[in-house]
Amino acid sequence: MTLKLCVLTPNRIFWDSEVEEIILSTNSGQIGILPTHTPIATSVDIGILRIRLNGRWLTMALMGGFARIGNNEITVLVNDAERSSDIDPQEAQQTVEIAEANFRKAKGKRQKIEANIALCRARTRVKAVSPISVGK
């Protein structure tokens, strides 16, 4: 038995196919979803989406949103998504360093919040390409 996974960003259908299992980062922690999962709606955190397809794990970086699970269908609406295979590890690490510097320099509540979000996004991209996350 499989699950139908659809990941949507504002600009495109990012993923639309059958999968065996997923592990999704939510605001209350990671959840594993297998066929016949209890129906739920949840917020999606800036974090990693792991997809098991044909016995192998794929890793993606998700940039926050919402998910609906029910009847062996998962619909994930996110601000942005990126496959680990599309991320340049060196560029991702440089982005973290820039985001950390911007976070340290941030003044005022709004700047600190925006800098923190940018840092979370940058760290998620690095995590998506780390050997432990990729799961080869």
Swiss-Prot record:
Pfam families: ATP-synt_DE (PF00401), ATP-synt_DE_N (PF02823)
This protein's UniProt keywords: ATP synthesis, CF(1), Hydrogen ion transport, Ion transport, Membrane, Plastid, Thylakoid, Transport
Sample GO molecular function, one term: proton-transporting ATP synthase activity, rotational mechanism
NCBIfam families per the UniProt record, alphabetical: ATP_synt_epsi
Protein family membership: Belongs to the ATPase epsilon chain family.
Cited function: Produces ATP from ADP in the presence of a proton gradient across the membrane.
Subunit structure: F-type ATPases have 2 components, CF(1) - the catalytic core - and CF(0) - the membrane proton channel. CF(1) has five subunits: alpha(3), beta(3), gamma(1), delta(1), epsilon(1). CF(0) has three main subunits: a, b and c.
Name by which UniProt lists this protein: ATP synthase epsilon chain, plastid
